[in-house]
Amino acid sequence: MKNLQASVRDRLLNIAQETNRPFSEILQYYGIERFLYRFGCSKYADKFVLKGALMFTVWQVSERRTTLDIDFLANYNNQVATIEKVIKQICKVPVTPDGLTFDAETVKGQKIKEEMEYEGVRVKFIGLLGRSRIPMQIDVGFGDVVYPRPKIIDYPVILDFPKPHLKGYSPESIVSEKFEAMVKLGLLNSRMKDFYDIWLMMRQFNFNGLHLVEALKRTFKRRKTTLPEDRPFFAEEIYDEKSDRQTLWRAFLRKGDIKIAPERLSDTARKIEEFLMEPLDAIKSNYEFHKVWKKSGVWSTPPGVSL
């Protein structure tokens, strides 16, 4: 086991040097990857859906932001003790040796409440690669609906160990949930990552208009939030270049070493409006939205479709 741990550590160090990333970040991603593998091998794999920024890794999105935790949607009991028990059992799932152990004795959960109607659960625990400690965090949400339905994904691996195999979120529902949170929070919105993630996704994906409209409708209905009908979608501070939100945006870009995004939050917000205005008009007017979003930046009508 010690030889394996040393070998894994050396290979991770090489990756850190080759990619010019901190070793701690590469180690964290390895811990996330191998824990997801254990999750996929467990009896709970069908009850949890991977969401959040880790899906950008699944989709191999370039310029994705760094994330150091795991987000799940669970079709499961939302009691802290119950989720703690699940995580403890997954820590002990027998797998092909990969140099890692997860200490079930360190598992500790607490309730969280963000934009969801139902309380979520945050669980922290420790992974170990030899003497190197990996602080793990999992946020579990409840009560949301995913459209289109979750698909089985193969999570990319850093080293040549088996890939995690589990359920993953749809791009449409990720956009819908982030947009709903941005609308609901209004003046309180300090979640710059949501602006960036939607802006990034609209540049990386083609979207089926019918699917995006349905995802928006279901998410806003489930969370009991009113869909915006007109521009501007967001609080006026988002568009004010002298507001503290602009300061937050610049700090977010600087911390994440993000160089491709607009320098001004207002420009990002207006791009998102261009992306979502037509789907929202379709919902407001109750007509079927057959257009397709091209990642080049326009909604277009597919050949053979008459509107």
Regions flagged by a language model, labelled:
Residues 1-48, 58-66, 70, 74-307:
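Structured mid-to-C-terminal alpha-helical surface segments
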Residues 50-54:
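Glycine-rich beta-strand-to-loop/alpha-helix junction loops that act as flexible
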